[in-house]
């Protein structure tokens, strides 16, 4: 492992429509095979559908959905004397957002709706109401961390 310098976090350009870095990151996570314009159109269409259903603005609705999926703790495997323990650790804010976005995209891809924009809109709507696959994933992670609270002293 090189020891020269610490590589900083790359600055992401905000998205063109709402000038939000969070939304730009979400578009990048949704993107497949470098098709960014397709990813942008899917996200913007999904946000339009979401705004029609709720009384919130585009970014407020997206932020509300993301807030309900963000994990606060997760477990990491730690080997201590021949046995592996699942040690609960706090999640850093950047990783919190990344995990939430990844879970929402994965849950949307697994849905059976017609278009990806509709699937994404439905998943975001479910996340706003604290239901759906992405929220369930977050709750499962929290439950696992809670169950392994006894091993918290193995933190590093």
Swiss-Prot record:
One of its GO terms (molecular function) is tRNA binding. Transmembrane segments: none annotated. It comes from the Bacteria. InterPro entries: Ribosomal_uS7 (IPR000235), Ribosomal_uS7_bac/org-type (IPR005717), Ribosomal_uS7_CS (IPR020606), Ribosomal_uS7_dom (IPR023798), Ribosomal_uS7_dom_sf (IPR036823). GO terms for cellular component: small ribosomal subunit. Pfam families: Ribosomal_S7. Keywords: Ribonucleoprotein, Ribosomal protein, RNA-binding, rRNA-binding, tRNA-binding. Disulfide bonds: none annotated. One of its GO terms (biological process) is translation. One of the primary rRNA binding proteins, it binds directly to 16S rRNA where it nucleates assembly of the head domain of the 30S subunit. Is located at the subunit interface close to the decoding center, probably blocks exit of the E-site tRNA. Belongs to the universal ribosomal protein uS7 family. Part of the 30S ribosomal subunit. Contacts proteins S9 and S11. This is Small ribosomal subunit protein uS7. It comes from Hamiltonella defensa subsp. Acyrthosiphon pisum (strain 5AT).
